[in-house]
């Protein structure tokens, strides 16, 4: 049965992303992001709506299209575009980003579209972990560089530009290779990028996070990555985990999971099984394909798997509110997330339960889902004061609770949380400080500038993710005058962060730092002027070519 067709205009790309929810299908097919609706539930879409138009603004490699549709913990739709770029206009915003791949997010109706992260080449799939962290594995450019495991953070730039693909001299791929932009973090690396966590795989395609039921417990908190190398003999699926490292993570337990299959995608069914799509063989279109269903007979038959299947196959709208609260601690993340979303639809009637779980609950994941749900309600109802009782949690004993509170305060525009966020900038956990700085950037209090300066000085460029969060904080809180006022600060780490902030603001005042005593700061200012570009500052950049004290 054909659910919908006709996606074959001259501009149409590969249909490369699907998300199904409540008899609606979100379908990614350049140049549109579509929403299809099967109103009478007969297996055919009666209506279709283009939520956005303008993805894929130029010719690029086959498959560098629109894909990766998934739901975030905030109830928003996240998706990716390869380096064919975009120029999209909605009633809310116009986004022009033609020269790299990107991650975007929006509400399920397409509103409030945001450019979430940039500088990617072709991030095929996105996956959230149990704590709301977003990851992708981005493809290499076949010139000695390697694919990258990317912790996707808001405002992050991974460094790729499509023009690099066509540079052969003096070095293939230009700055991508010569400046080692695809390498994990090392001292002296370009500071405007958020570096990858690791170089893994050769042809990353499908990526999925284990939901918590169906496999042996050793796979808890693991990702599964399809590695497409053109031949089944050398292709397959890896599993790996990430462990906390500063404000971000490091990779661990990287192992082959299923091998000798030209897998393109992997997903988890609701009854404990895994579904894997198989290209069969070769790089050319083979005109055939297979889908395998794989399962562990012992794990598949346990009570938690059967319970998760029953819940996900039914309707949570029929569950009492208290029962939904208990499901927030279920071992299957999909059950927890759907229970959270159902509680959100019940709006303020579910507030007492969510607050009780968030503040007094004993299960960490249930508390986190309750915090996310409260954040959703605060945003949807435009009543940030819903979060007032959560202020007590900034001193919670658990780092993750403090981090999620900081995160939700910014996302919900909770202005009363500014003082709490300033305190969290001094938290012993870099992850907590990361979210506090990022949220201050969203709330824009100018009296937080000095606190952010202190954070950046203390970090002293050691943690690039924390530096990025400090920059995002300054982008929202600091005007150019305040930034230039600290232009002679003894901390070169702070001066570097100011350059990065001015780069994001695309402000010609960045040229002031072409005379900085630290060559690393000068280099970053030069990159900002040339790469962005900031045309007004190009003459000042050209004038330093005669300086002999620069590398």
Model-derived features: where do they sit?
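Beta-propeller domains with acidic blade repeats across secreted/periplasmic ectodomains
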Residues: 1-323, 344
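Amphipathic alpha-helical scaffolding segments comprising HEAT/armadillo-like alpha-solenoid repeats
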Residues: 317-326, 347-359, 379-395, 413-426, ...
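Hydrophobic core positions within HEAT/HEAT-like alpha-solenoid repeats
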Residues: 325, 340, 355, 371, ...
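Core register positions within helices of long alpha-helical scaffolds
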Residues: 342-345, 373-376, 408-411, 415, ...
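Alpha-helix N-cap/helix-start positions at coil->helix boundaries
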Residues: 333-334, 363-365, 399-400, 415, ...
């Amino acid at each position: 049965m054909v659910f919908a067709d006709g996606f074959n205009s001259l501009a149409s790309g590969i249909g490369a992303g699907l998300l199904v929810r409540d008899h609606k299908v979100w379908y990614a097919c350049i140049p549109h992001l579509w929403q299809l609706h099967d109103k009478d539930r007969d297996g055919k879409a009666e209506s279709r709506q283009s939520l956005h138009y303008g993805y894929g603004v130029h010719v690029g490699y086959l498959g560098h299209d629109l894909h990766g549709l998934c739901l975030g913990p905030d109830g928003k739709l996240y998706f990716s575009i390869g380096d064919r770029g975009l120029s999209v206009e909605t009633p809310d915003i116009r986004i022009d980003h033609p020269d790299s791949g990107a991650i975007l997010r929006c509400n399920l109706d397409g509103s409030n579209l945001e450019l979430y992260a940039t500088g990617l080449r072709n991030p095929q799939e996105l996956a959230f972990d149990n704590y709301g962290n977003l990851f992708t594995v981005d493809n290499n450019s076949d010139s000695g560089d390697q694919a990258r495991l990317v912790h996707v953070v808001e405002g992050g730039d991974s460094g790729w530009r499509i023009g690099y693909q066509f540079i052969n001299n003096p070095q293939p791929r230009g700055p991508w290779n010569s400046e080692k932009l695809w390498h994990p973090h090392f001292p002296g690396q370009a500071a405007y990028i958020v570096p990858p966590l690791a170089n893994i795989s050769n042809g990353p395609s499908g990526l999925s996070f284990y939901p918590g039921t169906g496999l042996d417990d050793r796979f808890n908190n693991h990702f599964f990555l399809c590695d497409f190398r053109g031949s089944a003999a050398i292709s397959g699926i890896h599993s790996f985990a990430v462990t906390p490292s500063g404000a971000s993570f490091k990779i661990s337990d990287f192992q082959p999971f299923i091998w000798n299959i030209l897998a393109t995608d992997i997903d988890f069914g609701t009854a404990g099984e895994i579904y894997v799509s198989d290209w069969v063989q070769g790089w050319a279109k083979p005109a055939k394909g297979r889908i395998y269903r794989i399962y562990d007979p012992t794990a598949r038959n346990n009570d938690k798997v059967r319970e998760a299947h029953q819940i996900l196959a039914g309707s949570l709208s029929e569950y009492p509110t208290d029962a939904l609260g208990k499901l927030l601690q279920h071992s299957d993340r999909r059950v927890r997330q759907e229970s959270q979303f159902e509680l959100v639809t019940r709006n303020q009637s579910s507030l007492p339960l969510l607050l009780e779980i968030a503040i007094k609950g004993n299960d960490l994941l249930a508390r986190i889902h309750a915090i996310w749900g409260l954040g959703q309600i605060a945003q949807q109802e435009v009543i940030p004061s819903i979060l007032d009782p959560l202020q007590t949690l900034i001193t919670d004993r658990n780092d993750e609770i403090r981090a999620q509170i900081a995160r939700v305060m910014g996302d919900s525009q909770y202005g009363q949380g500014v003082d709490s966020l300033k305190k969290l900038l001094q938290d012993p956990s870099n992850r907590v400080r990361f979210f506090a700085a990022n949220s201050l950037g969203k709330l824009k209090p100018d009296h937080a500038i000095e606190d952010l300066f202190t954070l950046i000085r203390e970090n002293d460029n050691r943690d690039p993710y924390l530096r990025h969060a400090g920059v995002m904080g300054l982008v929202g809180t600091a005007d150019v005058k305040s930034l230039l006022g600290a232009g002679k600060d003894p901390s070169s780490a702070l001066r570097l962060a100011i350059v990065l902030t001015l780069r994001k603001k695309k402000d010609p005042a960045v040229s002031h730092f072409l005379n900085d005593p630290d060559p690393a700061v000068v280099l970053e200012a030069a990159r900002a002027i040339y790469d962005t570009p900031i045309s007004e500052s190009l003459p000042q950049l050209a004038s330093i070519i005669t300086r002999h004290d620069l590398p």
